[in-house]
């Protein structure tokens, strides 16, 4: 993030660091929008800042360490630090706030989705400018506000929190139970994003499939029309809205409830991308029971096969955990067999990490870290073989590619993504120089490209 908005040379400056997942990123965007609306300058560096805000992650141990280290660096370089995010809600082993215990000199600590609390702390330590010409309300920037992503794609969070209590996860203790955003608010933000040039909208939450469950799918309103607060209606409305802009809508964190089947016709019709990010975590029924996964009784293999019958182009992405407490070699082999048979297009895998506060730590049967890592490596070898074979099948096909990078207007090629590739987590399409000398590639625009090769998780394509 470069300096976001400069109000004046004398406006107080806030350094800002955003760590963690896409959900945390949207929290950062809300805070940055409010800061800018009130006349503060913002910067991604500590130098020259009057204070620093660190939005933290507290899910796994590596993320906790990164967050604590970043807070320490900010204190050392600047001295005035406000901490927000998931780590801010975490309790230390002996009780008390973990951040306060490790860094007692921070100015304030809040949990996630706490824009007002963060702003209160900023006001207490760095009074806002009182200039009527720059002291704006957030809507002056458009409802979409400031975004930390490139201009051509954006995340939109449709709910906060989660009603599930998976034994490996501590997110509900930090972000609370499911709270769905009013459907009218979501669609208003989406329209502002499309109007602002966004070509790919990535729908995120902790549990996208559960959107509206907490409000019993009550009817909201959009453009004066009644619209049910439910994922199917939201996806359909987003697809209709995106169409005039030629934009993509991509769904993430979609739990495999039966209701997900209703989305497939929208994908087959091209309303939303035929791409499902489904966090399955494992395949063996006993492991899923120990994980207390929602929809653990679903026959996921049959579900995926049925999805492909309805929408042959669908790409299924998922994440898995290897070495969960008590996992036997038979249970792990079941997972490998599932990967081969389900042919998951894009897969990630984590070796189980005993996150502080997770119920799974007390299940018993903790596996040695060496075995957990060995199983993760074995899983990824299978996943990469599946992915490579599926990418080879695309050679010779023509695909629409969203250009992410194109130095010199693409005269020497560039990088982009197809519908099968979400930013940051999937592969890319390596673009060769266009066939025609007159053709240019521009970031944020689509190009047709012929797939000519595959390299690892990536495709190689010739724009035309």
From Swiss-Prot:
Keyword Transferase attached: yes
Record-listed [4Fe-4S] cluster 2 binding positions = 162, 166, 169
Q: Where in the cell is it found?
A: Cytoplasm
| One term under GO cellular component | cytosol
State the needed cofactors, names only.
[4Fe-4S] cluster
Answer whether the UniProt record assigns the keyword Signal to this protein.
Answer: no
Q: Which GO terms describe its biological process?
A: tRNA modification
Quickly give the catalysed reaction: L-aspartate(89)-[ribosomal protein uS12]-hydrogen + (sulfur carrier)-SH + AH2 + 2 S-adenosyl-L-methionine = 3-methylsulfanyl-L-aspartate(89)-[ribosomal protein uS12]-hydrogen + (sulfur carrier)-H + 5'-deoxyadenosine + L-methionine + A + S-adenosyl-L-homocysteine + 2 H(+)
Pfam families per UniProt: Radical_SAM, TRAM_2, UPF0004
NCBIfam families, A to Z: 30S ribosomal protein S12 methylthiotransferase RimO, MiaB/RimO family radical SAM methylthiotransferase
Report the protein's function.
Catalyzes the methylthiolation of an aspartic acid residue of ribosomal protein uS12.
Which protein, by its recorded name, is this?
Ribosomal protein uS12 methylthiotransferase RimO
Q: What gene does the UniProt entry assign to this protein?
A: rimO
């Amino acid at each position: 993030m470069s300096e976001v908005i400069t109000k004046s040379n004398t406006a107080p400056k806030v350094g800002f660091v955003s760590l963690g997942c896409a959900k945390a990123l949207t929290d950062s965007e809300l805070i940055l929008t409010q800061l800018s609306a009130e006349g503060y300058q913002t910067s991604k560096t500590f130098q020259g800042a009057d204070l620093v805000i660190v939005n933290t992650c507290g899910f796994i141990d590596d993320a906790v360490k990164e967050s604590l280290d970043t807070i320490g660096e900010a204190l050392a370089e600047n001295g005035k630090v406000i901490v927000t995010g998931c780590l801010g809600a975490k309790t230390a082993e002996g009780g008390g706030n973990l951040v306060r215990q490790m860094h007692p000199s921070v100015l304030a600590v809040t949990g996630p989705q706490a824009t007002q609390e963060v702003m209160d702390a900023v006001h207490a330590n760095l009074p806002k400018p009182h200039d009527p010409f720059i002291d704006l309300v957030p809507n002056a920037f458009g409802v979409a506000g400031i975004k930390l992503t490139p201009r051509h794609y954006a995340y939109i969070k449709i709910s906060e929190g989660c009603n599930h209590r998976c034994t490996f996860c501590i997110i509900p203790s930090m972000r609370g139970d499911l709270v769905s955003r009013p459907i009218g608010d979501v669609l208003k933000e989406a329209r502002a994003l499309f109007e602002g040039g966004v070509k790919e909208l990535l729908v995120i939450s902790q549990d996208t499939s559960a959107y509206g469950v907490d409000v019993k799918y009550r009817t909201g309103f959009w453009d004066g029309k009644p619209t049910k607060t439910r994922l199917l209606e939201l996806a359909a409305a987003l697809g209709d809205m995106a169409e005039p802009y030629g934009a993509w809508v991509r769904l993430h964190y979609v739990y495999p409830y039966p209701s997900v089947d209703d989305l497939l016709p929208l994908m087959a019709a091209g309303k939303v991308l035929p791409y499902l990010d489904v966090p399955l975590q494992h395949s063996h029924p006993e492991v899923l029971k120990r994980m207390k996964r929602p929809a653990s009784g679903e026959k996921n293999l049959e579900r995926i096969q049925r999805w492909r019958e309805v929408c042959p182009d669908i790409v299924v992405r998922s994440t898995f955990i290897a070495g969960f407490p008590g996992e036997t070699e038979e249970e792990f082999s079941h997972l490998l067999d599932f990967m081969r048979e389900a042919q998951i297009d894009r897969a990630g895998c984590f070796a189980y990490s005993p996150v502080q506060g997770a119920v799974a730590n007390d299940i018993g049967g903790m596996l040695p870290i060496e075995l957990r890592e060995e199983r993760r490596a074995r899983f990824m070898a299978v996943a990469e073989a599946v992915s490579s074979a599926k990418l080879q099948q695309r050679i010779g096909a023509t695909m629409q590619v969203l250009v992410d990078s194109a130095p010199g207007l693409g005269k020497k090629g560039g990088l982009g993504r197809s519908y099968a590739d979400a930013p940051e987590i999937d592969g890319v399409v390596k673009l060769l120089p266009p066939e025609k000398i007159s053709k240019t590639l521009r970031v944020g625009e689509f190009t047709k490209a012929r797939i000519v090769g595959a390299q690892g998780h990536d495709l190689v394509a010739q724009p035309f």
